[in-house]
Design a protein with these regions (language model features):
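Hydrophobic, aromatic-rich transmembrane alpha-helices
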Residues: 302-333
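Membrane-interface coil-to-helix junctions
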Residues: 28-123, 146-167, 206, 256-261, ...
Length: 387
């Protein structure tokens, strides 16, 4: 929520904060590369899992087809077929244009550069959202943003590059929801839903679902008149954005349904997916195990101090309605991770194979938002935020 409705933050300082968030995330990735001996600081690369076994092959195929022709059709697909679904689901990212600039043998190293650039832009987007959401130009915001750009989801699931563009857009989309409620402007929301749907419709579905919960959270925290009128504008903006992307969405969905099979098969069950007592552990420990990919627990870690601040938010002197709204949203997200049927809805009504709770980055973003609310009210030391 807005930290101080009378505050008038400096736009110049806000822009500086966005740049600082970009540089801070970029520097953190560069430091990790240096410590791990990744190029250009060593001979290692970050190619692992699906990035190495799947996406490098797709990017190489795209690189060759751009130069040799045949973008819409390939004989390498079974006995030949359309590549529209493959492009829309796996390759529809503006960052992939960077691969086309360099020789094909440089793809492993370009992938590392793309990860660093995308992470830096994700931090900048989060800082933009925090600055607008809190109406603040505090120098703590770039550090707060780092916890989102390098949260457990962004690091562990970074090998699935198809999801990361929408992870970048998520803070901007929430900022657009704020703008709709505060000023009535709807075009930013329409534009961002369009971009998210074009970049990856699978993750866009998750962000759009969360935006509904976030809209209700904002409204319940500070109710005002005209709920149905404004909610109608919110729904219309989202539908318009998705509709503008229909030229790519509809044929792509049909092709993915044909190739993957059972895209819309529903097996709604209320069975738990994991022991609920394990969930708090994921907030305070960020160590990686292979079960993080193959198991069922969500990747929620976004900083120990951020999780502690989110807890302090509920003990702080904030409006009761705001705390109730935040608790309801957190409960809805926790149940979505825990209950199989709800989990299935978030994953497009198809059970995921590995990489569980692919929407958990949204929970990390909201936890950082609550942490920022408590942080800007109490202003603990900057060093504590990095814990």
């Amino acid at each position: 929520m807005i930290q101080n409705p009378l505050a008038q933050p400096s736009r110049r300082r806000q822009r500086q904060n966005i740049l600082l968030a970009f540089l801070l995330s970029l520097g953190a990735v560069a430091a990790a590369y240096a410590l791990l001996g990744f190029a250009p600081f060593g001979d290692g690369t970050m190619l692992t899992g699906d990035l190495n076994g799947l996406y490098v092959a797709y990017i190489t195929d795209l690189w060759r087809r751009v130069r040799q022709g045949g973008l819409g059709y390939s004989f390498a697909k079974l006995c030949g077929g359309s590549t529209l679904g493959l492009f829309a689901y796996y390759m529809d990212s503006p960052f992939n244009l960077l691969y086309l600039i360099f020789p094909v043998r440089a793809i492993p190293y370009v992938a590392q550069g793309v990860f660093a650039l995308r992470t830096a832009l994700t931090g900048a987007a989060a800082c933009f959202y925090f600055g607008r959401h809190f109406r603040s130009d505090s120098r703590l915001l770039p550090v707060l943003s780092l916890g989102y750009s390098l949260c457990a989801f962004c690091v562990v699931y970074s090998q699935n590059i198809i999801w990361m563009d929408v992870v970048l857009l998520a803070p901007l989309l929430l900022s657009a929801v704020d703008a709709l409620q505060d000023t009535g402007r709807h075009w930013p929301l329409t534009a961002l839903v369009l971009l998210a749907a074009l970049f990856n419709f699978y993750t866009a579905w998750e962000v759009c679902l969360f935006s509904v919960l976030y809209y209700l959270y904002r409204w319940f925290s500070a109710p005002r008149r005209g709920f149905w009128r404004l909610f109608g504008r919110f729904a219309a903006s989202g539908c318009l954005g998705a509709g503008l992307a229909a030229f790519l969405l509809i044929p792509s969905l049909l092709e993915v349904e044909e190739s993957k099979g059972g895209l819309f098969a529903i097996d709604f069950s209320l069975a738990p997916t994991f022991n609920l007592a394990q969930l708090p552990y994921r907030l305070f420990f960020g160590n990686f195990f292979w079960d993080d990919v193959t198991g069922s627990l969500p990747n929620l870690y976004c900083g120990v101090f951020a999780a502690a601040l989110a807890v302090l938010f509920f003990a702080g002197a904030f409006p009761r309605r705001e705390k109730i709204a935040a608790a309801l949203l957190l409960a809805a997200m926790a149940l979505s991770c825990w209950v199989q049927g709800l989990n299935l809805i978030w994953h497009g009504f198809k059970e995921p194979v590995w990489f569980p709770c692919r929407f958990s980055f949204l929970l990390s973003l909201f936890l950082r938002t609550l942490a920022g609310r408590a942080l800007l009210a109490g202003r603990p030391g900057r060093r504590a935020l990095l814990i």
